[in-house]
Amino acid sequence: MYFHENEFQFQSFIRIIKERENIDADIIEKDYYVCTVLKELAKQQDYLKAYFKGGTAVYKILDTMNRFSEDIDLTVEVVKEESNNSNKTRLKKSALGYKIPGLELDKDKTKDVKQSITAYYKYNTLFKDEENPLHKPGEIQIEATSFTVSEPIEVHTIEPIIYKYANKQEKDMLSKEFDIVPFEIKVQKIERIFIDKLFAAELYFEKEMYMDLSKHLYDLTILFKTKRIQQFFKNIGEFEKIVEYKREEEIYRKGGVNKNIQIKDFGYFNAEYNDDLLKAFKLMQDKYIFKDEYRITIEETQKALNEIRDKIVLLDQIKDLEKARKILNGEK
């Protein structure tokens, strides 16, 4: 039995966690449904070769990330030894194959474009926040793509908010009665997610979609502070390889970032933030940041972006010097 099938107990428990941790009830509820889907995915990953990525992945695997993310993004491996039909079947099942009571696939909204499928699952939300609602209340979006290389991949253990903030007695109840426990899932490495977000931010900046842009700018700021991303900038070969994966993906993606624009020239690095973006950045944090101590200022974000751009410029300079050295030495 799923926890949400016992509506009274489910609703009451979410209210307990809400009061204890001061986290909006609609966020706790949606996080539960997101994790329920991800747990089903984790059971099938060896076959599906579908890996968790994006902002929700970062939010679930990093203790330092406290921005709630409500969509599920998946990268589905293209296996060259398999037929096109076999690869397409795995892609479809990754987005459309979840049979969970209380989650209804909205077939009319489903989008199937080339190597990308976006599915929408409805659930009956018990908590409607009229003043500051989620971007997609009562709905989970799953986007599965099979553009290019999915790697690099690593394994992480994740858990829903209701388990994370439960006490020992409550965790025992969740585990024994509803099988709600931490579980392992294969995730794209945060280095790849970081590069993806550099490009996603540019896409939303160009389209003036400031709420989505604000989420990526927040994530980039937090990710940049981690030891792994700091080390990532010191590994030129790995950095170039992952950027190349992303460049190839953007070619296949409808409306992707122009291949001729260098990362250091992305518009959001040099833009003067207008009132619409500043308003969106505040609204994003008002709803999606769990606690006040995890809020950041736009100045902190701009400082981090300047440092990111400077590091990318330095990498380009090192690469150019290496090319010049090889030419002088007659190397290929």
Residues covered by each model-derived region:
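Structured mid-to-C-terminal alpha-helical surface segments
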Residues: 1-50, 62-66, 77-332
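Nucleotide phosphate-binding site architecture
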Residues: 59
